[in-house]
Amino acid sequence: MSKSTLVNVKNLSVRFPVYGGVLSRKVAEVRAVDDISFSIGRSEIVGLVGESGCGKTTVGRAMINILKYVAPDVEVGGNIIYHFDGETVDFAELHPRQVRKYRSRVQMIFQDPYASLNPRMTVQQTVEEPLKIHTELDKGKRKEKVIALLEKVGLRSDQAGRFPHEFSGGQRQRVGIARALATNPDLIICDEPVSALDVSIQAQVINLMMAVSYTHLRAHETEADLVCRLLLE
């Protein structure tokens, strides 16, 4: 293993149980991911490419240990080993609550920008939330950080008080990107971040992602070829 390796995924498998019958017993299982292994180095951009339904989203969610929130009975096998400043942590062995302390180190940008944003929270509140949880910045410093992040992703400071429904799809995804960048994570996992956007907006978002040098991009669009230095199929 290279000293610059950030995460090693070893023999990852994910199975979702299928229940049936009067007593709702397990009658089968769906193999969403079957024995996949790869590694990602620091400052490396990696793309996981495949057709719809092949398990890309499941791999991403497994890597940040949120599958239990989606499906409590899911079975996850293998190892997801992160190397944080000399500390080695296997996310596959941790309860989701135990992962919270590392959540600032690994962030995710979701496919549907509208569904991933709380409609009752302003952009200011959305981007500020991870700063409240994972940093000790006071209110003034947090506000300054939020404004800087919005400007970094191409939004204006006077848009901070608006709600998600007041933005276009591309702008909402920019908010999601700003939120993911807030804690300066070691790894950002992108779940097909442009697939729900118009083609013209896709180019803008991809250019933005290239500008901020993401550690990890995961998509099945061919545009990923333009961004990733390594493609896994």
Tell me the role of every PLM-derived stretch.
Residues 182-186, 202:
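A short, proline-enriched helix->beta-strand linker immediately N-terminal to the Walker B motif
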Residues 54, 215-222, 226:
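Conserved small/polar residues in nucleotide/adenosyl-binding loops
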Residues 49-50:
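The feature captures the beta-strand-to-loop junction immediately N-terminal to the Walker
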Residues 163-167, 171:
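Conserved ABC ATPase signature
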Residues 23-26, 83-107, 133, 139:
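ABC ATPase NBD coupling module
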Residues 177, 189, 205, 226:
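Hydrophobic anchor residue at the start of the ABC signature
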Residues 79, 83-86, 140-158, 211:
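Conserved ABC ATPase "signature" region
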